[in-house]
């Protein structure tokens, strides 16, 4: 499930797919799009991908609840949610709505982004939330141009997520 954008439809190359509703046990449920054996729902299926999603916290939280609760997910091995960076109403709604068994924090290596990752780790490990951090993934670690495949350019810094993981015992 992807709350704010077209990321999931783009990554799975299903931008033109449209989920539909089906009545199951007297309830109208959204049938997720399925690709590669993975069930997908994203706000990107319901809004124009070129338009900004301008929602206040409550609207975004309600959309998240609908993506989670009003869909026929069936039996799942894992339920993965792509959330925006930081700590927001979305994250609070998530931990209040689902019994979360773990979180994976994704961050590029630059210090500004790592500050958000640090806040996310602190939020999930807070005594009131108590969600274990399963790992910290460094995204956009380096750039390799096609014409120089042996070169790596660390344009956002180097090993920032690794340093944060060590600092926070993740």
Would you name each region that the model predicts?
Residues 1-4, 136:
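Walker A/P-loop phosphate-binding motif and the immediately C-terminal alpha-helix
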Residues 3-50:
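Phosphate-binding loop that captures ATP/GTP phosphates
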Residues 4, 60-64, 113:
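Internal, well-ordered alpha-helical segments in soluble enzyme and binding-protein domains
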Residues 8, 41, 64, 82, ...:
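Residue-level signature of catalytic and energy-coupling elements of molecular machines
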Residues 14, 73, 129-131:
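Helix N-cap/coil-helix junction residues
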Residues 18-23, 42-93:
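Switch II (G3) loop of P-loop NTPases
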Residues 77-78, 84-170:
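Conserved catalytic-core segment of NTP-binding enzymes
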């Amino acid at each position: 499930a992807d709350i704010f954008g077209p990321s999931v439809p783009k990554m799975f190359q299903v931008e033109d797919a449209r989920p539909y509703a089906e009545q199951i046990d007297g309830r109208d449920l959204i049938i997720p799009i399925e690709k590669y054996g993975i069930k997908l729902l994203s706000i990107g299926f319901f809004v124009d991908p070129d338009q900004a999603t301008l929602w206040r916290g409550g609207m975004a939280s309600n959309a998240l609840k609908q993506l989670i609760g009003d869909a026929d997910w069936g039996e799942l091995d894992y339920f993965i949610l792509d959330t925006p960076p930081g700590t927001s109403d979305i994250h609070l709604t998530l931990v209040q709505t689902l019994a979360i068994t773990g979180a994976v924090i994704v961050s590029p290596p630059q210090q500004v982004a790592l500050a958000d990752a640090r806040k996310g780790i602190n939020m999930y490990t807070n005594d009131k939330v108590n969600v274990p951090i399963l790992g910290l993934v460094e995204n956009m670690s380096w750039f390799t141009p096609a014409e120089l495949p042996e070169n790596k350019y660390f344009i956002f810094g180097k090993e920032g997520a690794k340093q944060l993981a060590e600092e926070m015992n993740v």
